[in-house]
Curated annotation (Swiss-Prot):
One of its GO terms (molecular function) is antiporter activity. It is a multi-pass membrane protein. This is Probable multidrug resistance protein NorM. InterPro entries: MATE_fam, MATE_MdtK, MdtK-like. One of its GO terms (biological process) is monoatomic ion transport.
Amino acid sequence: MATTAPPNGKWRRLFALFLPIFVSQTGQYAMNFVDVAMSGHASAEDLAGVAIGSSLWVPVFTGAGGILLALSPIVSHHFGAGRHDSITRAVAQALYLAVALAVAIVLIGAAAVPFILKQMSLDENVRHIAFHYLRALSFGIIPLFLYSVLRYFIDALGQTKVTMWITLTALPVNMLFNWLLIYGHGGFPRLGGIGTGYATAITYAYCFAAAAFAALKFRRLAPYRVLVRFYRPSWAAWKELLKTGVPIGSAIFFETSIFAAVTLLVGRFGAETVAAHQSALNFASLLYMIPLSLSMALTIAVGVEAGANRYEAAKQYCLIGITLALAVAAAAALFLSAFRSHVARLYTNDPTVAALTGKFLLYAIFFQVSDAIAAPIQGALRGYKEVNAVFWSALLAYWGVGLPLGCALALLTAAGAFGYWIGLIAGLATGALFLSFRLRAVWRRHDSGRAPCAF
């Protein structure tokens, strides 16, 4: 059974988990930025094609990939309880499930993507680039999902530095193949934005190969013999993964898709408003990397303690994580209050767009507070395997409160496009409040020794 850290040591332990995860998440964000920036230097049509393709791919990956995130609390529970053979078995079954999910996405995408693109009012060349970008990227979906499984296995054992280094080394790989395939250097064909898809697929394959090497060779990972010991596919094991993973993946999909929906709805207010909205949302997403990384670290820490039946220690990690997130949110809010105009000018030289971006960033301040509460609690509840509450929170808060309220304010009042952001803030706050009550209920249940509830 894994040992717990003393109360003061829990701060250091959580930070040691958080920092590499944060670097990894920021590295992934940087790869997306590089793809867009390098495509834009090819042509405006290449940039548009990659942007359209990416907007279709990201919600699918975050939703389907979120199913595999179930492996993290499962492994951390086994690790906390000292069930090491069960870890190897769970990883093997997750690898099988990853391949099945990836194949399903490729087959469904092959049929659905042409139809979806035809329904969009796109220039024919942009549509061509978007389709072939996604087709090129599809060659990397199986390696990406296999890498996701190995990453969650490695992270759940507390070895988050391994995936940090994989991400950091993947960034130059991605940049190199973008340079070769987008612009046609080194004897490669000049593919423009389509080359971004192939470069991304190659980067996914690199990440899987690097994670496989680490799993086989690193001292703290090799004893589990993943990729060496084989088991028959087990529906019972898949059922456990899906029971935990489908609510997680659905919650992530609801969260990512609401922002995509709002971006489409803001379009009615003109190009300048869309540009300002997208710029402010981009920066807010960058700041969100901090509470998101804390959330992932808490899933691991709480999962280990819950697996070992040390519920008081798990509660201490929850309180530490929320405290850290609130402190960071306060700092981010002060930064945005003081420097929002400077941030806006990083995105545009147009004074009208910059002024609008600054106003949107004022609303982003309220994002920080809600995210600082909701994100760590989401991670903690996943660590407890309390995933249904996270699912219902995302569905009701974003689509039941946030979007309807945002539409009403945007279309029926003078708030305009800012009404959508007010709706998002209300949704985030509702979700944070709901999750807070749910976490307190989990604590009370474990204090009294009652059985878990379905909701």
